[in-house]
């Protein structure tokens, strides 16, 4: 099994009850990545101190905003075994430089996600290749944003967003992540 820690990356216990709030909170984090990195590293240090944690086998997993955030931390040289991003943002204002990425990366993406356009996928692959990253990207055809969230269809309808759950992509991405983590912790 694994020990998990959920980080409050928005800060101050903020919770988004509407997509506009989430956009505002996430935007504030993206505007100050040094603060985000400090917050992330504080959580990582707290996790390492737990008696049931093997600090030589660490991974970060994120969904949506969190998925983009774990990729940003990898680009900034996060020194852990693995990061996994589920329908996270692939774009960046600060592309990884060669030799910067120290962690293995797994990205699970909806090929029809308008929040992660095909050109962003191509740019991400080019960036990772140029950086010499050890990464995998699984692009699920016919799959939209939030494909791992069983409530995605309802939330998409409620807020007018292109969200759609995919039981198949959800199951496959989870299974692939399990294998990815086992391989990363060898």
Give residue ranges: language-model regions.
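Short alpha-helix in the alpha/beta-hydrolase fold that links the catalytic acid
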Residues: 117-128, 140
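Acidic catalytic loop of the alpha/beta-hydrolase fold
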Residues: 112-116, 145-146
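C-terminal catalytic histidine-bearing segment of alpha/beta-hydrolase fold enzymes
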Residues: 131-186
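Short beta-strand/loop motif that positions the catalytic acidic residue
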Residues: 101, 107-109, 140
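Alpha/beta-hydrolase fold nucleophile elbow
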Residues: 51-63
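A conserved short beta-strand
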Residues: 79-89
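Gly/Ala-rich beta-loop-alpha elbow adjacent to hydrolase catalytic centers
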Residues: 62-66, 70
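Serine-hydrolase catalytic machinery in alpha/beta-hydrolase-like enzymes
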Residues: 1-52, 150-164
């Amino acid at each position: 099994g694994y020990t998990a820690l959920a980080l409050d990356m928005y800060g101050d216990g903020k919770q988004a009850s509407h997509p506009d709030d989430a956009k505002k909170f996430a935007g504030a984090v993206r505007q100050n990545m040094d603060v985000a990195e400090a917050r992330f590293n504080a959580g990582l240090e707290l996790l390492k101190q737990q008696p049931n944690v093997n600090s030589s086998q660490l991974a970060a997993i994120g969904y949506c905003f969190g998925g983009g955030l774990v990729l940003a931390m990898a680009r900034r040289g996060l020194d852990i075994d693995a990061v996994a991003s589920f329908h996270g943002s692939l774009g960046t204002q600060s592309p990884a430089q060669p030799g910067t990425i120290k962690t293995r990366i797994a990205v699970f993406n909806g090929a029809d996600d308008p929040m992660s356009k095909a050109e962003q996928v191509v740019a991400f692959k080019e960036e990772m290749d140029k950086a010499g990253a050890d990464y995998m990207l699984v692009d699920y055809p016919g799959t939209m944003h939030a494909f791992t969230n069983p409530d995605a269809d309802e939330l998409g309808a409620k807020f007018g967003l292109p969200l759609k759950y995919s039981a198949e992509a959800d199951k496959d991405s989870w299974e692939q992540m399990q294998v990815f983590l086992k391989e990363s912790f060898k």
